[in-house]
């Protein structure tokens, strides 16, 4: 016969949520900086090709 499990305490639940949110925040920051670097690199490449086209 199935027996109900004990209820998880609120503090344990909050702790797990906090850990999850910190991991998500860390990944979001990392993704932002990667996108930022890629954007800067793309802008730099566009500027270089624009300069090369105007010199010719």
UniProtKB/Swiss-Prot annotation:
Disulfide bonds: none annotated. Signal peptide: none annotated. One of its GO terms (molecular function) is structural constituent of ribosome. Pfam families: Ribosomal_L32p (PF01783). It comes from the Eukaryota. GO terms for cellular component: chloroplast; large ribosomal subunit. InterPro entries: Ribosomal_bL32, Ribosomal_zn-bd. It is found in: Plastid, Chloroplast. One of its GO terms (biological process) is translation. SUPFAM superfamilies: Zn-binding ribosomal proteins (SSF57829). The keyword Lipid biosynthesis does not apply. Keywords: Chloroplast, Plastid, Ribonucleoprotein, Ribosomal protein. Belongs to the bacterial ribosomal protein bL32 family. NCBIfam families: rpmF_bact. This is Large ribosomal subunit protein bL32c. It comes from Tupiella akineta. The gene is rpl32.
